[in-house]
A protein has these predicted regions:
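Conserved Nudix-box catalytic region and its N-terminal flanking loop in Nudix hydrolases
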Residues: 20-56, 143, 148
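Active-site-adjacent beta-strand/loop module that shapes the phosphate/pyrophosphate-binding cleft
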Residues: 74-95, 124-127
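A short coil-to-beta-strand element that immediately follows conserved catalytic motifs
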Residues: 62-70
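Short connector loops at helix/strand junctions that flank enzyme active sites
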Residues: 8, 16, 36, 63, ...
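NUDIX/MutT-family hydrolases
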Residues: 88, 97-129, 146-148
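Acidic/histidine-enriched, glycine/proline-rich intrinsically disordered or flexible terminal extensions
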Residues: 130-148
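Conserved N-terminal beta-strand and adjoining loop/helix that marks the start
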Residues: 1-21
Length: 148
């Protein structure tokens, strides 16, 4: 029995600076709203190197010691499994700037959930900030998120 499946690997990181976190106002036509920096993992790179690269490309910041917190995943209509590896980081260097992905800004962490969030970001925020939660599986057919 062949158990192989098509998988898309991506990553996302919540960056903290004291009581603030960095948000990205995503402007991609298919995924808009407030999110965290991140993107696709290239075929030859490690997960950690991917999040460091993506954060740098989208923000100008080089994060250090990112910590993997969990996964947000779902099965697309064509059967492809989509995995988002979730990280947090509080050590970084560099000068903050926006990119083609959208505008970036620091906000109070307590203000995150009142932002115009992109789909799934409430669950992402919970996974990153709750040590008792490590995965959210989204079922497209029912539009239901199962957080564990």
């Amino acid at each position: 029995m062949d158990r192989s499946q098509k998988v898309i690997l991506t990553c996302m990181c919540q960056i903290s600076n004291d009581d603030k976190i960095l948000i990205l106002h995503k402007v991609n036509n298919s995924y808009t709203g407030v999110t965290f920096p991140g993107g696709h993992i290239e075929e030859t790179e490690s997960l950690t190197n991917a999040i460091i690269r993506e954060v740098y490309e989208e923000t100008g910041l080089t994060i250090k010691n990112p910590v993997m917190c969990g996964i947000y995943d779902w099965i697309q209509d064509d059967g492809t499994r989509y995995l988002v590896f979730l990280y947090r980081a509080s050590e970084f260097t560099g000068e903050l700037h926006s990119s083609d992905e959208g505008e970036v800004e620091w906000i109070k962490k307590t203000d995150f959930l009142i932002q115009p969030l992109a789909h799934g970001m409430e669950a992402v925020f919970e996974i990153i900030n709750n040590e008792h939660v490590s995965e959210c599986f989204f079922e497209i057919s029912t539009m239901k998120e199962t957080i564990r």
